[in-house]
Amino acid sequence: MSEENVQEFVLKEDCELRFAAGDDSDVCLELVKGYAEIFGTELLLNKKYTFPAKSRVAAFTWKGATIELVGTTESAYVAESTPMVIYLNIHAAMEEVRKKREEQAAGNSNKAKGPRLLLVGPTDVGKTTVSRILCNYSVRQGRTPIFVELDVGQNSVSVPGTVAAVLVQKTADVIDGFERNQPIVFNFGHTSPSANLSLYEALFKEMATTLNAQIQENDEAKIGGMIINTCGWVDGEGYKCIVKAASAFEVDVVIVLDHERLYSDLSKELPEFVRLTHVPKSGGVEQRTGQIRSKMRGENVHRYFYGTRANNLYPFTFDVSFDDVTLCKIGAEQLPDSCLPFGMEVENHETKLVIMEPSADIKHHLFAFSRSTKADENVLKSPVFGFCLVTEVDLEKRTMSILCPQRTIPSKVLVFSDITHLDDQIKR
């Protein structure tokens, strides 16, 4: 790279280098001197980290550092005011709770349960980043927290349109984030809870039940606690979802990012034992347009099938006969009361399982492989094995071509997702 694309920044303690990579250029970061971290993951001295075009990154130092950037940046500056001390204090408070509960449970066969923290706030206030920082700090403390992702629009554990959770056993990769090994994933199939509120609520309650059962067999996960990220819908029904999620996951800490009214409302609604804290957003958080959000969802689906630069994946493409699988979806049209027999109550159409007939309309849609062996009510309650992408539909031959991580389909029950993706076969 040319000489003019090299920038060196000297950071004083408690400062942060914020930069945005250009639209068409990678940016290489190197910690030349001192100590620094990116979203809670420590940087290695003299190691080069290459961030792809359009990356938004913040490198923070507690003790001072010299950092070199090579490549074209859209912006790059040092910020002296950051909320990192607040995040560290939240982590310290969580660790104090863990230690106290461990002491209280000493000699008790019923092992201690760690703190459960819910992050809430409107869109573009940095909830996902704070979640990552707190998870990383917990891991560096020797803990293994569970990260729960309830943001179905910008999911950081699985594909968009899912409710997901993963046990965090190592700090996030500086560039690629957390490993996505053996996540628990429920298929919601939409990018906003408003598309099907009953289903969304049912799924996060099912997730809470599933995690509560699993941690009984894993003492480290139990004391590690949970860090739960939510979507940015905080008004009306979105607010009700926050309150219900806090109850379902039995949270004892709620962090409200940059929304004083939400903080005030929750302080009146949540039980007294829930510790509520209002935190300002970082000055480095940027607003994302609808176009950017859509592009990020596409990149997330692409990553699911093809991996990342550092960890390439090689999916399979093959044909599946419609006669060998059952296509279904959750949610049906609501029938008016006048269409029902006398005395019969209307069932919840939003959580009703519907068998789908093959059609050309399923092309470019994701389908989830259900763990349920039959297309029945268990589909709603079951996590999924994974996802496939329908790339072609041949109604005459009654087949569809799919992009699939596995060589063969792991389930014959395929659940529709409204998430679409045009597979361009180009590795980013």
UniProtKB/Swiss-Prot annotation:
Keywords: ATP-binding, mRNA processing, Nucleotide-binding, Nucleus. Pfam families: Clp1 (PF06807), CLP1_N (PF16573), CLP1_P (PF16575). One of its GO terms (cellular component) is nucleus. One of its GO terms (molecular function) is polynucleotide 5'-hydroxyl-kinase activity. ATP binds at residues 16, 56, 124-129. GO terms for biological process: mRNA 3'-end processing; tRNA splicing, via endonucleolytic cleavage and ligation. The keyword ATP-binding applies. It is found in: Nucleus. InterPro entries: Clp1, Clp1/Grc3, Clp1_C, Clp1_C_sf, Clp1_N, Clp1_N_sf, CLP1_P, P-loop_NTPase. Coiled coil: none annotated. SUPFAM superfamilies: P-loop containing nucleoside triphosphate hydrolases. Required for endonucleolytic cleavage during polyadenylation-dependent pre-mRNA 3'-end formation. Belongs to the Clp1 family. Clp1 subfamily. This is Protein clpf-1. It comes from Caenorhabditis elegans. The lineage of its organism: Eukaryota, Metazoa, Ecdysozoa, Nematoda, Chromadorea.
